[in-house]
């Protein structure tokens, strides 16, 4: 018989790039999880905006099991029916004419940046290689994407970094305009900065970026890894703004918990990519594609997307009520079910401590830096789960405040 697994085993065996919670989840259903001891948690973290339909959704399980009984993998020397169906669904639902599949958001962003460089090289010459990104952004952990993310803490120990990447201030079109010129090949931006604090872009900012890119023949890349697939109440957040990118990256919720990512592109952009210019062994595998296809079927409906907007109101109303009692937050912001509670000056830097109190109370939340408590629950979270989870969060806030004043 094998030895029981404990949380301490993580500290013994794993490369220490994470600091996971003190419990190990073993079972989930809907927006509830249970740990090894049987304690129940309401999940408002959603696997960092991944579990868009909660845990163990029956239709996702059915799609996975059905494909698993056929075949799992062939490699990119062959295509398969699930990936072609998935590609058509994404094309029909968005601006895109072509799709490249991969396994994560970082890979999707890596592909987008490589495509942008190649597009500019082929059309305009090697001088046009500049990339403009934004401070406090997050685009992934590859060397290219971590360099595009404007957070030195994630990149400072890995020099030399890829060159020709500059960072403007987010939501500041004048700052961006000062950096975007005829040597710029692409601008990459999140419609809502997730890891950077749940900061929505303004309409004027995204529209201004579109105009600047058009003026300087640069590609506009929307990183919708966290905001995509219904998270904001539209299939993709850019649909709130009426701004169409040249490239869009998507992952996280696309697989509902199964690893998958995709780069969406116009025909013109995709035309510079030829056999061998990019690839991945597992991208577009039939298991991931079957699940993602079902995810899109379930999420891309008026009922589901309108339900996200309704659930946003449930959360914001109750979070404001909690804040009225405990005066923790200066602002509750976000779109749909990507919500950030910004700590006021009295509690600055203590988001992690609040998230730890929440776990003790039986509710899982995220942070976005030291000053923002982040919520990214399942898009189909029930009213009862919202009520129960926020009751527990209120208890955590009460304990946090009373502990600090004792």
From Swiss-Prot:
It is an enzyme of class 2 (transferase). One of its GO terms (molecular function) is pyridoxal phosphate binding. Keywords: Aminotransferase, Arginine metabolism, Pyridoxal phosphate, Transferase. GO terms for biological process: alpha-amino acid biosynthetic process; arginine catabolic process to glutamate; arginine catabolic process to succinate; ornithine catabolic process. Gene3D superfamilies: Aspartate Aminotransferase, domain 1, Type I PLP-dependent aspartate aminotransferase-like (Major domain). The keyword Transferase applies. Its cofactor is pyridoxal 5'-phosphate. Pathway: Amino-acid degradation; L-arginine degradation via AST pathway; L-glutamate and succinate from L-arginine: step 3/5. CDD domains: OAT_like. Pfam families: Aminotran_3. The modification N6-(pyridoxal phosphate)lysine is found at residue 252. The keyword Transferase applies. It catalyses: N(2)-succinyl-L-ornithine + 2-oxoglutarate = N-succinyl-L-glutamate 5-semialdehyde + L-glutamate. PANTHER family: AMINOTRANSFERASE CLASS III, SUCCINYLORNITHINE TRANSAMINASE. Belongs to the class-III pyridoxal-phosphate-dependent aminotransferase family. AstC subfamily. This is Succinylornithine transaminase. It comes from Escherichia coli O1:K1 / APEC.
């Amino acid at each position: 018989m094998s030895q029981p697994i404990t949380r301490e085993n993580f500290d013994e065996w794993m490369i220490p790039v994470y600091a996971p919670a003190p419990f190990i989840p073993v079972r989930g259903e809907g927006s509830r999880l249970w740990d090894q001891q049987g304690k129940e948690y309401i999940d408002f973290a959603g696997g960092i905006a991944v579990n868009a339909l909660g845990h163990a959704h029956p239709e996702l399980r059915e799609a996975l099991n059905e494909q698993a009984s056929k075949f799992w993998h062939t490699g990119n020397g062959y295509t398969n029916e699930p990936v072609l169906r998935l590609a058509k669904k994404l094309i029909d639902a968005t601006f895109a004419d072509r799709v490249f599949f991969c396994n994560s958001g970082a890979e999707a962003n890596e592909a987008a940046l490589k495509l942008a460089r190649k597009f500019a090289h082929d059309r305009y010459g090697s001088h046009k290689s500049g990339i403009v990104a934004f401070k406090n952004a997050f685009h992934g952990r590859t060397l290219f994407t971590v360099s595009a993310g404007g957070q030195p803490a994630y990149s400072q120990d890995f020099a030399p970094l890829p060159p020709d990447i500059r960072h403007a201030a987010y939501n500041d079109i004048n700052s961006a305009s000062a950096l975007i010129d005829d040597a710029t090949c692409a601008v990459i931006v999140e419609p809502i900065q997730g890891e950077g604090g749940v900061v929505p872009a303004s309409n004027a900012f995204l529209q201004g970026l579109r105009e600047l890119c058009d003026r300087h023949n640069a590609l506009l890349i929307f990183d919708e890894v966290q905001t995509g697939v219904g998270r904001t109440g539209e299939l993709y957040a850019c649909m709130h703004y009426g701004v169409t990118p040249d490239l869009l990256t998507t992952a996280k919720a696309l697989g509902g918990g199964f690893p998958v990512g995709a780069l969406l592109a116009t025909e013109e952009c995709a035309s510079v990519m030829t056999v061998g210019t990019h690839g991945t062994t597992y991208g577009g595998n039939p298991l991931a594609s079957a699940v993602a296809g079902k995810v899109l079927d379930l999420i891309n409906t008026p009922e589901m997307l309108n339900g996200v907007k309704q659930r946003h109101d449930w959360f914001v109303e109750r979070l404001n009520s909690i804040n009225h009692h405990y005066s923790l937050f200066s602002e509750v912001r976000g779109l749909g079910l990507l919500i950030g509670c910004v700590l006021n000056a009295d509690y600055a830097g203590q988001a992690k401590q609040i998230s730890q109190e929440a776990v003790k109370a039986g509710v899982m939340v995220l942070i976005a830096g030291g000053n923002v408590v982040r919520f990214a629950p399942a898009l189909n979270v029930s009213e009862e789960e919202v009520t129960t989870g926020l009751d527990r969060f209120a208890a955590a806030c009460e304990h946090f405040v009373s502990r600090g004043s004792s």
